[in-house]
Amino acid sequence: MTEKKITTKVRVYSYNELTEEQKKLVDLAREATMNSYSPYSNFKVGAALELDNGEVFIGANQENAAFAGICGERAALYAAGAKYPGVPVKSVAITSFTRDEFVVEPTAPCGVCRQAFLEFEKNGHPIELILAGKEKIYILDSFQDTMPLSFTEF
């Protein structure tokens, strides 16, 4: 038997250390949390993504009693894909809000969202992932970094 160690590089920033482009996405993601419909979890997730063509899309999680809701990340991703099919996603910012404040630690996307974004990376274009907490912000170079043992071929 052999053992393999898998690591992921995460860069940690404060808001003031971000580029203006990254700040814009974080601000839009924070605003998007207020569009969340989350009466069951009371956990609002907002996302903002930028395409390579400069277009920006926002999304917020939408719940329902059947638990077949959609996450904020995928809401933004699918809206962008419907309007601009084939245009690569450059970066996405994600943040969460609960109990009347933004979460302290950055929130990572669920497995379904990770897989969805990986599908959009199949064109060989990594998507920068910005996870914004109240003060701390994590940045990853690609969604592949969130799922090192992922599958993208069927």
Please name every model-derived segment:
Residues A60-R74:
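Compact, glycine-rich, soluble single-domain proteins
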Residues C71, A75, V112-Q115:
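Short amphipathic alpha-helical face segments that pack within enzyme cores
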Residues E50, Y78-G86:
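Alpha-helix C-terminal capping segments
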Residues N42-L51:
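Short beta-strand scaffold segments in enzyme catalytic cores
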Residues N53-Q62, S91-T98:
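Glycine/charged-rich beta-loop-alpha catalytic/anionic-binding loops adjacent to active sites
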Residues M1-N35, Y84-F154:
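C-terminal binding/interaction regions
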Residues Y37-P39:
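Short Gly/Pro-enriched turn/cap motifs at secondary-structure boundaries
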